[in-house]
Amino acid sequence: MEVKILKVGKNELSLEIKGEDYTLLNLLQKTLLEDKMVEAAGSKIPHRLLETAIFSLRVKGGRNPFDALYEALDRIKAETLEFREAFEKALKEYQAGG
């Protein structure tokens, strides 16, 4: 995966992301939109054969778009860690016959 910053404004940010499809980007979008200070977040893939996506983020009232992105990534990381721990527990129970 490669990420390139295309545009940075006071309340907005656009990224070009190579080697990624909607799977990760939809999760990122959903997580960002849970933040009440995020006005809009979304992605588009201009051509499906190029494997390049454009991700855009717009925040409200002086919120730093980089901070919003970092916080969303931290929440995603925490959720995946929580899932991993729950899965490992379930696997141990299954292997123990329960």
Question: How would you describe each model-predicted region?
Answer:
Residues 1-98:
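Protein-protein interaction/assembly regions in multi-subunit complexes
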